[in-house]
Design a protein with these regions (language model features):
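Short helix-terminating capping/connector loops at secondary-structure junctions
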Residues: 1, 32-37
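Early exported N-terminus immediately downstream of N-terminal targeting peptides
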Residues: 6-10, 38-40
Length: 119
């Protein structure tokens, strides 16, 4: 079976539950079918706020974010968005990967064969 590479793009805070549910479904499928995946979530614009650990704790998203990260899902965060909203990298979960520009990360991943999903 071919390994699927998927990048989920999120730029609106209200879409986090849908993205995290989609991730959960893909990870469950991986367990059930032994299919291999490379998964990344790219957060930019206002969606970066939910990757601040304190905010995630207060919105009850923390477990739904930590579980996929522990299973190898990459959470990439746009540095341009962090700068725009004056968010320090230190406020993010330690597993977050800060990328210079979200749009470039999306383009690079798509050129590497990642499927683009924007719930």
């Amino acid at each position: 079976m071919v390994k699927l590479k998927i990048i989920f793009h999120i730029d609106e805070p209200n879409n986090w539950p849908m993205v995290l549910e989609s991730l959960k479904n893909v990870l469950n499928n991986a367990k059930e079918t032994n299919r291999k995946y490379e998964l990344e979530v790219l957060a930019n614009s206002m969606a970066v706020f939910q990757l601040r650990e304190l905010i995630a704790r207060n919105t009850h998203l923390i477990d739904k974010i930590i579980e996929p990260a522990e299973q190898g899902v990459v959470f990439a965060v746009c540095n341009n968005s962090l700068n725009k909203f004056n968010i320090s990298k230190d406020e993010l979960f330690s597993f977050c990967k800060v990328v210079p520009a979200g749009i470039i990360e999306l383009a690079e991943k798509q050129s590497e064969g990642y499927l683009y999903i924007k719930p």
